[in-house]
Each structure stands twice: as structure tokens, then as C-alpha cells.
Amino acid sequence: VLRFVTPEWQSSTLLVVLAASVALAAFLAPRTRWAELALLCCLLTPLAGVVLLHAWHLHYHPAAQFGWLAWALLFAVHFWALRRLAAQLPAGALSAAHVLGCWLLLGVLALELRYLLLALSEHYNAWRWLGWALLPSAYLWLMALPRRWPWPVAAYPREYRVLASAPLALLMLGWFWLANVVSAGEAEPLAYLPLLNPLELGLLFALGAVFAWARLGLAELGVESLRSQWLTQGVAGASLFALLTAMVMRTAHHWGGVPYQLDALLDSMLVQAGLSIVWTL
């Protein structure tokens, strides 16, 4: 493929080849009772992840060059193969395949959303930050709900609600702190309004998702109830304090003309007055 296909079409072609190969293997494995062939089907998402890393760049568009069709085909084959081969695969391999597939699906969708949000701006502003976090945060919100979801979540609740969600929760918490500190909150063409702007609404959405998942997920990981309560409340409190502090600085930047640089913000009387009021509350 790398030799005969032009570079812009290589990733889509590789994904289709992988999907077709695994579909054939998943079809033959139960008929031939070939356990090793069934196990090879679990390599679909890791190999697709390698293709994604090979194709990725700052303006990567997963849906380009019929990528939308290639990725849709790959994920359809992935879930079909796992359902067809469930009785033939070792429990550990089956569990890992579900978790890796979940991460890959969210990653591809997040990259596509990020690309679409890039069209809203020319600078690295709040829209680009939101592209990374909205879908993983929405997933955490959904997994925190007590309702029963259809297959595969219903059949493998620990894989989707706990094993796949725990690293995402840590990732979203890290994203919260990084975006809160680094981003000045520009979201052209929208004007900046404290707490009512895309960045800070997105930060609250991500933090709420982490908190909602942690209330149930930490117990599934074996964390004691009292310790879990202290941990979630402590992290949420510290994060909200950091958000309000940065909100004051962003407000001074947009409304008071203070450069969004640490030295300038700390030296600003406007920032100091705003922090005094917010911290007193």
C-alpha cells in the first residue's frame, strides 16, 4: 500500500485493508475453530492506532479522502468481530480489545471535531482547546449514568464504565488544568463573558464529567467511600478555585487590556482587586 498508493490516500487505504483482513479472519475463525486466528482479530485497533499516528499532523482531518468511510468500516468490523468471537477469545484479550477500541473511537471523533472547530478560528484559541475534550467528557457523563446501555456496554460494563473511563477522567482533569492556565479564552466571533464563554463552559463541562464519573468509578476501582468522597471534593474544590482565579485574569485581559502574561497579570492592580473580591467570596 505504501508503495503503490499516493500519500494522501494511504491511511484510508490501509484502514480498509485492515478492516477487510480482520473481517475475513473473524468469519473463518469460528468455522475452522482456529483460536490463533481469532486472537489476531484483536490486533485491529492497535494497528489502526499505528495508522492514525502515521497520518496525524496538526491539521489532520480523519474524514478526508473517504476517511469517514474507512473509519466507519473499521469500527463496524471491530465490534462485529468482537461479538462474533466472544466465546472463542481469552477473557483478557477480549477485555483489552474493547477498551482499546473505545479509546480509538473517541480519539478519532475528537480529532474530527477538533478539525471542524479549527474552521472557526485562525489562532490557537478556545475553539481548538474544546475540540480535544467535548467528546471524551460527554462519554464520561454517559458512563456515569446508572441506566443500562445497549451492547457492548451492557455486556462489558467494567471495560467501558471503569477501565476505559478511568484514564479518560485523568486525561480530562489534566486538560482542564492545562487549558485553564494556558488559554486566554478568545473565541471569535463571540465576545468574552466571564463563565459564559466557550472555554469556561467547556471547562465546567469537563470538570463536571470527571466529578460525576468519579463518584461511581472510584468505588469500582476499590477506593473506600470516605476516601473517595474526600478526594473528589478536594479535586473539584481546587479546580473550581483555579477556574475562578483564571477567570478574573481572563476578564482583566479582555475587558481591561492587560496582556495575558503571568508577570503582567500579577502586576495589574485590576487583577489584584478582582482576585481580592473573588477570593473573599
Predicted features, each with a name:
Residues 1-281:
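Alpha-helical transmembrane segments of multi-pass membrane proteins
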